[in-house]
């Protein structure tokens, strides 16, 4: 696996990990919070024999540029990064794989209907309409998503500074996985990246720029416009891989998922949580491999 820092036409420089034959079908894999391309560290070797894998650190994460303005993390800007990355690598058409926030951008690209995206694979990342509806109607999901309200608090950086990045690492991953199973190298790398000037604010700005309404538990709120407006059906093939033990994104996110497109398959993973790409890389690879090959 090699790494490059690519200047993009969107004005940032993006760190990208690359592996697989350059003449193979291209797949862009988008990570989520609070990670980097390292999300795919155990999955990539299982897919790279017949696929060209492109694994960026999305803006604000890892070794990519970290704009400090909240507006720099609007969905349209993040989508522009995706297509600018493909342009920088000379990739015309590609499949998308997204986890967590990376899935949010992958969903957005598919909903937009850009013809460059040939197929979509999602790993534990909710469709925006289903997610917003669940935040209004499902008290369990609303309670599980209160961390989003915390991340939007302008004083959250001070909170993390107070507890330290070691404790933040434990809070971020500890409720999802056994911390003892995370390699020491991964822990030290993430903490070093988060400790850089402006890194934490850049990551949190993904939540602050989001228009997703996250009400406090137990209160009644008006139905957001996101729920009321019509969403176009996704025309390309979609495969949703879901760790059913996800404590942040509950199984309610799978309700109605088959209605969001014309060709949607769901692969539930029992005993697997939110960080499925490195909790169960073999199972995720088994679900991805035939799909990304067009089968």
Feature locations, PLM:
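Hydrophobic "lid"/C-terminal helical patch
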Residues: 82, 284, 288, 292
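Conserved HGGG/HGGXW glycine-rich cap/lid loop of the alpha/beta-hydrolase fold
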Residues: 17-65
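Active-site helix-initiating loop/hinge in glycosyltransferases
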Residues: 32, 74, 199, 279-280
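Catalytic histidine-centered segment of alpha/beta-hydrolase-like enzymes
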Residues: 272-281, 285
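A short, glycine- and basic residue-enriched loop/turn
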Residues: 36-37, 104, 272
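Flexible "cap/lid" subdomain of the alpha/beta-hydrolase fold that forms the substrate-access gate
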Residues: 1-3, 12-14, 26, 54, ...
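Short, hydrophobic alpha-helix immediately C-terminal to the catalytic nucleophile
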Residues: 41, 107-111, 285
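Alpha-helical elements of the RecA-like P-loop NTPase motor core of helicases
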Residues: 38-41, 201, 251, 286
